[in-house]
Swiss-Prot record:
Cellular compartment(s): Membrane
Upper classification of the organism: Eukaryota, Fungi, Dikarya, Ascomycota, Pezizomycotina
PANTHER family: ALLANTOIN PERMEASE, NCS1 FAMILY PURINE/PYRIMIDINE TRANSPORTER
Entry protein name: Transporter aclS
Annotated Basic and acidic residues bias: 592-607
Length: 607
């Protein structure tokens, strides 16, 4: 008996130790902490320039550089590719801004807004459901999309850090000839060399202090990384054009699509690739594995997760459309020009910058450019979301939302124990534990499946746009997003909103034949099914948007149009409150007292 009591006491001490410190602005509960509460004005520091710098992290990445090469490899000409890029980027900017308004106007992220769509996760439902059904209850509502995102993000974290480690390996090989000549002490069955695993470990160590910074305090860091990334990629392009004495012949190569039908579908597929999936065709160099396939570009979560830091909604509007359309269209052109020049130099078009560095005779130039590429990869591993499309060889995964995104999702899942910082480190540890080189070498089917998840994520975009703009008409009751009492308008049926299920299923189920064919080409499907899968992102976006609007118009959810009378969480400025009709007299102390009461209620019901 004494042993049992002692064991229970140790568990209680451990439980108290892992809980977040309660000295923040918000009383901790199972629904809220400082990082997932509606952000107060003091934390909303992002200006237009911040958004330009933040989203430039992706636009100045190796992934975006190689996008043009992927489309040219699909038989489009360079200039047809650029038309597809500009049109695709324009559509992407529109979707990003529409979803970004959720965070910019109400200052909440994906895990919290998911409660409005799918239902609050009802920890306090012990009063209304049997205790033995706790597991089923916890998996209801907003937990589903959040768990899906976390799984994808952790895998993305693993692959992204591995790519960064390969860039570190290239730098060390350029600086230290002895490192380059180091004998490999690992067996072939390890699927990784000694040099590569050292570079991977160093990259993960470098990530630790970067992940420590809060998103609202990372502006200067991201600007510095963007400058180094842009300088490296610009330098590679200038060097290539200079040595080739021009852009070469590839830039003038005509399209291989001869009929108007095939050309039209090719351009449409290119636009779809830009909007929903972006490509990297990584070559078989010693430093970079050729792994990529489909991953959603416009994951609905990322936009509102970061737009909630905006000082005002207009900051995210200009910042995103300028970055998506202008900067996002320039880098694929740089990639096409460089590849055309390298074809004239080496007799082969090189689409992957690390490959160019690997064969460069200038060690100093390769090292400095490599540092820029590492900074780009490090920035991606911290903040951004990426995507890819069919590579010419091994299918894989790269650049899915990582770093801050996994921190925000885990914070939304377990707000009493995890904030953004802790979530980032949990994601880093889990990503390292996956040993990405093993997945790339021996789990081809797994990588293909996980990298094709854009078909499951794209409907979330349509559902978010429909729900916020057409159903709720941009009005939310924030206080009901942070409890699971039955009287809340987001409680629905036992914490679950069935209205979101059908639109999500319609958005991806018809794509399953093409999805299965992409994983196993031996599975034969019709041309129509294959084409529908190729256009999966716009189909998922538009179909889920239409069905969600129809279902909610026919079966309206409770509380449409309701908002809080008082500024419960101290969220709004005076101007925002006046525009919404919210009373600013309420204080954050009132909110804290309410949250403490709710926390006590949860404890009492569990006892």
């Amino acid at each position: 008996m004494t042993t049992v009591i002692r064991y229970g006491t140790r568990l209680e001490h451990l439980h108290e130790a892992v809980k977040l410190s309660p000295h923040g602005q918000t009383a901790l509960s199972v629904w809220i902490n400082d990082d997932i509460r509606p952000l107060p004005p003091s934390r909303r520091t992002w200006s237009t320039m911040t958004f330009i710098g933040w989203w430039s992290v992706w636009q100045l990445s190796l992934t975006n550089w190689q996008l043009g090469g992927s489309l040219v490899a699909s038989s489009l000409s360079v200039w047809q590719t650029m038309v597809a890029v500009v049109l695709g980027r324009t559509i992407a900017a529109i979707v990003a801004i529409l979803i970004g308004y959720i965070g910019a106007e109400w200052h909440i992220g994906f895990p919290v807004y998911s409660r409005a769509i799918w239902g609050v996760f009802p920890y306090s439902c012990h009063r209304t459901v049997p205790r033995q059904s706790n597991v089923g209850v916890i998996l209801k509502g907003a937990f589903f999309p959040t768990l899906l995102r976390i799984g994808l993000t952790v895998v993305g974290f693993a692959f992204q850090s591995y790519t960064g480690g390969l860039c570190v390996t290239a730098i060390l090989s350029g600086i230290f000839p002895t490192f380059f000549r180091m004998s490999n002490t690992l067996p072939a069955s390890a699927h990784v060399t000694t040099q590569q695993i050292i570079g991977w470990a160093i990259f993960n160590i470098i990530s630790i202090p970067v992940l420590y910074r809060r998103p609202e305090r990372s502006e200067k860091l991201m600007i510095g990384m963007n400058i180094m990334s842009f300088a490296a990629l610009l330098g590679i392009m200038i060097w290539s054009l200079s040595h080739a004495h021009g852009a070469g012949d590839l830039i003038h190569q005509p399209s291989q699509l001869q009929t108007s039908d095939s050309l039209g579908f090719g351009i449409m597929q290119g636009i779809t690739t830009v909007v929903g999936t972006l490509s990297i065709a990584l070559s078989r160099s010693p430093f970079v594995y050729p792994y990529l396939k489909y991953v959603s570009d416009l994951d609905s979560a990322s936009q509102m997760d970061f737009s909630r830091f905006a000082r005002k909604p207009s900051d995210q509007v200009f910042g995103q459309w300028f970055t998506f359309i202008i900067i996002g269209s320039i880098m694929p052109l740089f990639g096409c020009l460089t590849s055309s020049a390298t074809q004239a130099i080496y007799g082969e078009a090189l689409w992957n910058p690390p490959t160019i560095l690997a064969i460069s005779t200038s060690r100093a130039a390769a090292v400095f450019a490599g540092i820029g590429l590492v900074s780009s990869q490090l920035a991606l591993n911290v903040v951004d979301n990426g995507k890819s499309s069919p590579s010419q060889s091994v299918k894989g995964f790269s650049n899915y939302p990582v770093g801050y995104s996994v921190g925000m999702d885990l914070s939304g899942l377990l707000p009493k124990y995890i904030n953004i910082r802790r979530g980032c480190y949990v994601g880093l540890i889990l990503g390292m534990a996956l040993c990405p080189w093993e997945l790339l070498a021996s789990a081809t089917t797994f990588v293909s499946v996980i990298s094709s998840f854009s078909i499951f994520m794209a409907p979330f975009c349509g559902i978010h746009i429909s729900d916020y703009w057409f159903i709720r008409q941009r009005r939310l009751k924030l206080s009901d997003l942070y409890h699971a009492r039955p009287e809340g308008i987001y409680f629905y049926t036992m914490g679950f909103n069935w209205r979101g299920v059908l639109p999500w299923l319609v958005g991806w189920v018809p794509l399953l034949p093409g999805f299965m064919h992409s994983i196993n080409p031996a599975i034969k499907v019709s041309v129509g099914a294959d084409h529908l899968y190729a256009l999966g992102f716009p189909y998922g976006l538009l179909s889920s948007m239409a069905i969600h609007t129809l279902v909610n118009k026919c079966f309206p959810p409770p509380g449409i149009g309701e908002i809080d009378r008082d500024d419960t969480y101290g969220t709004f400025t005076v101007e925002e409150a006046a525009k919404l009709g919210v009373n600013k007299d309420s204080t954050e102390e009132d909110s804290d007292r309410s949250l403490r009461r709710e926390s006590r209620e949860v404890v009492e019901t569990k006892v």
